Amino acid sequence: MTAPKPVVLCILDGWGLRAEREANAVALAETPTFDRLMATCPNATLVTHGPDVGLPRGQMGNSEVGHTNIGAGRVVAMDLGAIDLAIEEGSFPQNPALRDFIGKVKAKSGTAHLMGVVSDGGVHGHIQHLISAVEVLAGEGIPVVIHAITDGRDVAPTSAGEFVGQLVRVLPEGARIGTVIGRYWAMDRDKRWDRVKRASDAMLHATGEHAPDAEAAVAAALARGETDEFIAPTVVGDYAGARDGDGFFCLNFRADRAREILAGLAQPGFDAYDTGARPDWSAFLGMVDYSKEHDRFMTTAYPKPVIRNTLGEWVASHGLRQFRIAETEKYPHVTFFLNGGREAPETGEDRYMANSPKVATYDLQPEMSAPDVSDHLVEAIGAGYDLIVVNYANPDMVGHTGDLKAAMAAVEEVDRGLGRAVEAVTKAGGAMIVTADHGNCETMVDPETGGPHTAHTTNPVPVILVNGPAGARLHAGRLADLAPTLLQLMQLPQPEEMTGRSLIDA
């Protein structure tokens, strides 16, 4: 029996399952294609959080974690847990890159600027990592300025006051908060350089809103109608900007939303916007690798481990062709993260990126660029590829806005695209796995506060087999099991590095 061609992995980003219909965009939306597949095709559920994806117990998954595990075909120990462990066991203060940073800043009598997410969301950063770094640097007698990035997306939308207060209460002598900036400005990943400029101008030149202290900055933003994610870049107290000889340490451990701001702060030859005069940094450190380009001007505390024989690498090694498609917001996930942290395409790997719409928030355009993604997906299905990986961003990105009606519209647009994909795959004689990397839009109201729920969830996600082998059934599993499942459909052997198990029962 010949292998189906193409085999498609369709990732409905942020599409989780929850029994209750209330505030559940997936359940409340009109989804005829998804409903039909669930009723007629083999299906099961996957776990996308905690130890099953290499995270601490109870920690919700996210798109980086999800796509890394999917592409690896094994559970990958993620940075959050590794850094947590280093802090707990006491090795963090002796990290070689951190010691080098300390030495260089001291040699120039500089100030250490620390930028990090001030929340315990654990998706891009963690407040405890920031606190630990402040303690180490202040303990070395180095003045510390914190650039506090407020979250409101991976945690409750108006929780920044609590987190900033927690940080203020534990600051050692010699440490202070210099700026308070919502992640909307400091953590863009879609080349909205006007936002990034406002964040870097506050950090570098002390321009923006002003507040006497960090807690007042949060309160003033709330009074202006800004929830935590959108807090306008605010200069705290008499902070006067960065100077020659200062050092900069980015505490974020996820690459995609750190790259732009770091480039604006220090990348040689940067010209996306006018940065003004930038300081001659004595040291520029990142918690993790952000990209090969960033490695040219930064050092790294915790380099990424090499993941060998990812799904893409293994398929390429067998001389097969593959295609990756997503819109801007999720393009790094189906390329960089799915390929184990490598930017370059594999041999025979083609890509298409649809441009995400230039709107302030995606509830204003919940269809996003899904129609363009669907058009190119249908075209690729008929183009002779062996493997296609597609990501629909809408359920996650619109789910993050907390707008239930918009999330329902997003889900319905994705369902239309899914219908087109099913039709094209059937016509081509291919097979498809439909799944998600984590939940989000199935919970749009916070059950504890009654306010909008904007974060990911720990709910299970669906996995559906479309046009699979006759008599096939699926069993429950985790994201690491998807690559072995795809390889089974493609009739390829599984590399020994992949410890996941195919979800298909004959």
Curated annotation (Swiss-Prot):
> Which cofactors, if any, are listed as required?
Mn(2+)
Q: Which GO terms describe its biological process?
A: glucose catabolic process; glycolytic process
The alphabetized UniProt keywords are: Glycolysis, Isomerase, Manganese, Metal-binding
Q: In which pathway does it act?
A: Carbohydrate degradation; glycolysis; pyruvate from D-glyceraldehyde 3-phosphate: step 3/5
> Which class of enzymes does this protein belong to?
isomerase
Coiled-coil parts of chain:
none
A GO cellular-component term linked to this record: cytosol
Write down how the cofactor binds this protein: Binds 2 manganese ions per subunit.
EC code: 5.4.2.12
Q: Name one GO molecular function term.
A: manganese ion binding
InterPro entries hit by this protein: Alkaline_phosphatase_core_sf, BPG-indep_PGM_N, Metalloenzyme, PGAM_B_sf, Pgm_bpd_ind
Q: Which residues bind Mn(2+) 2?
A: 13, 63, 437-438
Q: Which domain of life is it from?
A: Bacteria
Question: Which Pfam family, any one, appears in the UniProt record?
Answer: Metalloenzyme
* Binding annotation for substrate: 124, 153-154, 183, 189, 254-257, 330
Active site, UniProt feature: 63
Q: Matching Gene3D superfamilies, A to Z?
A: Alkaline Phosphatase, subunit A (3.40.720.10), BPG-independent phosphoglycerate mutase, domain B (3.40.1450.10)
Residues annotated to bind Mn(2+) 1 = 396, 400, 456
Enzymatic reactions = (2R)-2-phosphoglycerate = (2R)-3-phosphoglycerate
Q: Give the family from UniProt.
A: Belongs to the BPG-independent phosphoglycerate mutase family.
The record describes the protein's role as: Catalyzes the interconversion of 2-phosphoglycerate and 3-phosphoglycerate.
Assembly, per entry: Monomer.
From the Swiss-Prot or TrEMBL record, give the protein name: 2,3-bisphosphoglycerate-independent phosphoglycerate mutase
